[in-house]
């Protein structure tokens, strides 16, 4: 396969809409393209596109997600950039995986997974694969830039807090149910601020009010709802935070009945920079003319699911600038995409001859 074939691969994948939970057309297309390249390709029980190539004792999983967030961006190539929804997050990394693995390496079996529902709270594709036997190495497909490797992601906790109470006349004394909900939010925010005072970036616990509705009533019951999201650094557990929120909500919700529902939760994930896999990337990036750097991310990825489940060397890697994730300007520099394929080939060669 040539570089132009690899560019057509990523362009074709980006051209197929694949909103989270609606990935079927893109999955079938990618399975067909992998089969053409010599992969043993299929759709697994979760709906993931899965391609396996090569034989050998060493097993490397390259898992990227095939779903995208909403947003219709006309797909085109301009000034050496592929523009379109998913070009960076994360069809570019996924296509680079397929392109790199097409070149077989003696003694190495590679499984490429185009995972579904990464952009949904379910992470259904990764969770399905997590139940399988662990590989020797795992690379998660997320934009890091061609010469950088991501070794840590914050965790995530999404909560829905509902307050209900008997309906009251509008002239009745005391706070409204909406005001009680605001008191709950203030207590949660203040407690979060006390957790990591003075911390910046990756070390900081971030807490946001992501949505609120209030004052709804059917004439019998008044309701208010908060949607609260945390980004969690290593050292803080999601169940610990959820317990704290339940205590705070019930203590500051006045006479309303308060329920706290966990909508989604992922523990923080961090992997050492000294693993054979991380060193393989350092060497492969150097061979491609770069100097590797390591990144930590405030978001989450399928690494949060697979790193604790498999307990094997794991990093996230892929071409693209993550500042374009989920934006109307999503674009992938194609030269960087081709460089990333070269780096990934170097990593796979090193898997056949471990450092």
Residue positions per predicted region:
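Short, surface-exposed alpha-helical segments at coil->helix boundaries
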Residues: 7, 24-28, 94, 242-246, ...
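Active-site metal-coordination/substrate-binding segment of hydrolases
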Residues: 57-114, 128, 328
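Acidic/His- and Gly-rich active-site-bordering loop/insert found
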Residues: 1-87, 303, 311, 321
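Short beta-strand/turn micro-motifs at beta-sheet edges
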Residues: 72-73, 147-151, 213-219
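Metal-dependent amide/peptide-bond hydrolase catalytic core
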Residues: 143, 157-355
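Short glycine-aspartate micro-motif
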Residues: 61, 82, 136-140, 158-160, ...
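Acidic/histidine-rich catalytic neighborhood of metal-dependent amide-processing enzymes
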Residues: 95-156, 162
């Amino acid at each position: 396969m040539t570089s132009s074939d690899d560019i057509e691969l990523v362009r074709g994948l980006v051209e197929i809409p694949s909103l989270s939970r609606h990935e079927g057309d893109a999955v079938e297309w990618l399975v067909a393209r992998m089969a053409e390249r010599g992969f043993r390709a299929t759709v697994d029980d979760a709906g993931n596109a899965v391609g396996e190539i090569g034989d050998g004792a060493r097993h490397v999983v390259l898992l990227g997600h095939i779903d995208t967030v909403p947003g219709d961006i006309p797909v085109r190539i301009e000034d050496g950039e592929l523009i379109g929804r998913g070009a960076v997050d994360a069809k570019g990394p996924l296509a680079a995986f397929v392109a790199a693995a097409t070149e077989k390496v003696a003694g190495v079996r590679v499984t490429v997974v185009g995972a579904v529902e990464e952009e949904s709270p379910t992470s259904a594709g990764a969770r399905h694969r997590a139940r399988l036997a662990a590989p020797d190495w795992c690379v998660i497909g997320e934009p890091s830039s061609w010469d950088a490797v991501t070794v840590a992601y914050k965790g995530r906790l999404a909560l829905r807090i509902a307050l209900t109470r008997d309906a009251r006349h509008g002239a009745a004394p005391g706070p409204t149910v909406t005001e009680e909900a605001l008191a709950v939010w203030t207590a949660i925010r203040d407690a979060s601020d006390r957790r990591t005072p003075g911390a910046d970036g990756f070390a900081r616990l971030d807490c946001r009010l992501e949505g609120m509705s209030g004052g709804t009533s059917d004439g019998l019951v008044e309701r208010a709802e908060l949607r609260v999201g945390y980004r969690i650094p290593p050292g803080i557990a999601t169940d610990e935070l959820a317990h704290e929120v339940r205590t705070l909500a019930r203590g500051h919700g006045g006479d309303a009945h308060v329920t706290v529902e966990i909508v989604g939760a992922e523990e923080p994930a961090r992997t050492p920079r000294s693993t054979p896999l991380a060193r393989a990337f350092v060497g492969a990036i150097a061979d491609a003319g770069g100097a590797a750097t390591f990144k930590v991310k405030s978001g989450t990825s399928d690494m949060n699911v697979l790193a604790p489940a498999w307990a094997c060397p794991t990093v996230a890697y892929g071409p693209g600038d993550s500042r374009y994730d989920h934006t109307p300007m999503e674009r992938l520099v194609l030269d960087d995409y081709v460089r990333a394929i070269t780096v990934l080939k170097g990593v796979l060669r090193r898997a056949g001859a471990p450092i």
